Amino acid sequence: MENTQENPTSQNPKPAEETARQAAEAAAPQQEAAANAATDSPASAEQAALAEAQAKIAELQESFLRAKAETENVRRRAQEDVAKAHKFAIESFAEHLLPVIDSLEAAVAHSSDDPAKVREGVELTLRQLTGALEKGRVVALNPVGEKFDPHRHQAISMVPADQEPNTVVAVLQKGFVIADRVLRPALVTVAAPK
């Protein structure tokens, strides 16, 4: 007769093996989670670093845009200031010329037959004009007796003279400078070499 009873050990594994198998099955998700956590840990650290870098980039971009806008504002204000300076630079000078205009208009309105009075009026007006020019730092050049300077003088002719050669003998037309910059060179005659 055959033994119809099966070996209980073949159907039912030993309780220790079963427990080990169950423990292994239960531990598998935990190990997988731990492995994922181990792999997630560098990934999450990388994501955190990436997020931090992106935040820093956004902050720097905003800072750059603000600085660029401020630079544009400064440049625009500087251009406006220069434009205003050019527009109104002559204002002070023009204010000094207004009395000269008043004097000339008065002379035209009250013309006199007396040449002495007319001359006196013209001389006063010339002094007013010279004063206005000097207030604007415009000064006349009268270089008689000075060495010829091609930067400040324009020689019209050379004449024999008792003076040292290349010395200004006569001024045909005054020159003018404004703050050491030549507006118009003086037209002069120069002593010729002997």
Swiss-Prot record:
Keywords: Chaperone, Cytoplasm, Stress response. Its main location: cytoplasm. InterPro entries: GrpE, GrpE_coiled_coil, GrpE_head. Residues 1-50 are annotated as: Disordered. It is found in: Cytoplasm. SUPFAM superfamilies: Coiled-coil domain of nucleotide exchange factor GrpE (SSF58014), Head domain of nucleotide exchange factor GrpE (SSF51064). One of its GO terms (molecular function) is protein homodimerization activity. One of its GO terms (cellular component) is cytosol. One of its GO terms (biological process) is protein folding. Residues 21-50 have a biased composition (Low complexity). Residues 1-13 have a biased composition (Polar residues). Pfam families: GrpE. Belongs to the GrpE family. Participates actively in the response to hyperosmotic and heat shock by preventing the aggregation of stress-denatured proteins, in association with DnaK and GrpE. It is the nucleotide exchange factor for DnaK and may function as a thermosensor. Unfolded proteins bind initially to DnaJ; upon interaction with the DnaJ-bound protein, DnaK hydrolyzes its bound ATP, resulting in the formation of a stable complex. GrpE releases ADP from DnaK; ATP binding to DnaK triggers the release of the substrate protein, thus completing the reaction cycle. Homodimer. This is Protein GrpE. It comes from Paraburkholderia xenovorans (strain LB400).
